[in-house]
């Protein structure tokens, strides 16, 4: 039985409270809106662990704009992990294949990255495919872009698909670091078959649902 609170939340994001129709949830990295056929659950700030910290988490997360606090003790106790915002580093150590149509044609290096969490009603599966720009037959393309992660000399993160035309967090330009986004490139000669992969070429990605 679906609760009244959940029904209210579904109405708020424009979804009918129909428990017989499932869906999937994905994160659109670098954007504040979802694709035309998806519903926005929330938008926020891309966040993760400090790029030089060997501990903490290795994944990126999408923090909502308005946190809801539970029990807390202000001030750092040095007993837990810390979460930082995420900066674009394209154009520094890596190439910049991204479109700038959502940022007035300007360079977005050192700007903070937004994110959007999206719901695909009626399409219950989603997948991120690296090195593809299109989806398999029968699948819906939610967005496409380029594969990003932290740089090789930094501590490891997951690979995520950054939208091909990123946006930035307003007022978030400063070289303060935190978690970082660098473009991923194919590296031949160490188990990766080349061709068809090309040494040093930036890798695309696509997020698909069905």
Describe the predicted segments one by one:
Residues 1-13:
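N-terminal, immediately post-signal peptide pro-regions of secreted/luminal proteins
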Residues 21-198, 202-210:
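Folded, disulfide-stabilized extracellular/luminal domains of secretory-pathway proteins
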């Amino acid at each position: 039985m679906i609760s009244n609170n959940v029904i209210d939340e579904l109405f708020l994001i424009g979804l009918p409270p129909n428990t017989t129709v499932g869906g999937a949830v994905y994160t659109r990295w670098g954007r504040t809106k979802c694709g035309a056929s998806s519903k926005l659950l929330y938008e926020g700030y891309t966040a993760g662990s400090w790029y030089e910290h060997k501990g903490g988490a290795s994944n990126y997360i999408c923090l909502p704009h308005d946190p809801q606090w539970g029990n807390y003790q202000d001030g750092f106790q040095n007993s837990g992990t810390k979460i930082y915002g995420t900066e674009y580093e394209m154009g520094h150590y890596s190439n910049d294949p991204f479109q700038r149509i959502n940022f007035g044609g300007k360079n977005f290096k050192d700007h903070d990255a937004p994110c959007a969490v999206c719901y695909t009603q009626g399409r219950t599966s989603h997948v991120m495919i690296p090195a593809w720009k299109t989806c398999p037959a029968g699948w819906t393309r939610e967005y496409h872009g380029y594969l990003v992660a932290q740089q090789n000399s930094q501590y490891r993160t997951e690979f995520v698909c950054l939208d091909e035309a990123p946006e930035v967090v307003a007022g978030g330009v400063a070289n303060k670091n935190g978690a970082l986004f660098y473009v991923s490139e194919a590296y031949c000669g160490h188990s990766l078959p080349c061709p068809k992969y090309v040494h040093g070429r930036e890798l695309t990605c696509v997020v698909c649902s069905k």
